[in-house]
């Protein structure tokens, strides 16, 4: 009986003390800022991420190229009473119109935040860059951020 009790206590101690590492799992698609900006490739990945955010449907993938803006400018005709008519007649209180503009502004500021993260880290880590990539990455991040602010 004592032997069984010792095994039980030992097993309980292993389970209680050993679970912390198993529960601390980092998702493969996320990375910590320090890890991301430790190498030149991390800065490039962050910049590519900003471009990918820009091509979302809520920004230049749809709303700010050929749908929402066209209805606001009244370039397109619509056949039914829909949110497109509300866009064309500037009824901004419509729930779908509000959601559309909310997603546009939210995505704009996500892109600005991504560029700000790059710019906050790039000057302190010039040593990780080769050739002229420092100027290239910093210039593109500044340009994207300026473009987003201009469009807002």
Segments (PLM) and residue ranges:
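Membrane-proximal, proline-rich intrinsically disordered regions
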Residues: 19-67
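Conserved, well-structured interaction surfaces
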Residues: 44, 82-152
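Secretory-pathway/luminal and periplasmic proteins that interact with or process carbohydrate-rich
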Residues: 55-61, 75-78, 148-152
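Acidic helix-start/capping segments at beta-turn-to-alpha-helix junctions
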Residues: 67-74, 137
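Sec-dependent signal peptide recognition
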Residues: 2-10
């Amino acid at each position: 009986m004592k032997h069984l009790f010792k095994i039980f206590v030992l097993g309980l101690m292993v389970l209680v003390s050993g679970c912390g590492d198993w529960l601390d799992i980092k998702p493969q698609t996320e990375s910590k800022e320090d890890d991301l900006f430790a190498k030149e490739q991390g800065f490039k990945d962050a910049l590519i991420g900003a471009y990918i955010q820009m091509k979302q449907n809520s920004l230049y993938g749809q709303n700010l190229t050929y749908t929402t803006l066209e209805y606001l400018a009244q370039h397109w005709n619509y056949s039914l009473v829909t949110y497109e008519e509300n866009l064309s007649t500037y009824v901004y209180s419509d729930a779908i119109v509000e959601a559309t503009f909310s997603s546009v502004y939210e995505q704009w500021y996500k892109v600005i935040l991504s560029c700000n993260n790059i710019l906050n880290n790039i000057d302190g880590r010039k040593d990780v860059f080769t050739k002229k990539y420092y100027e290239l990455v910093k210039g593109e991040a500044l340009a994207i951020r300026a473009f987003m602010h201009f469009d807002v």
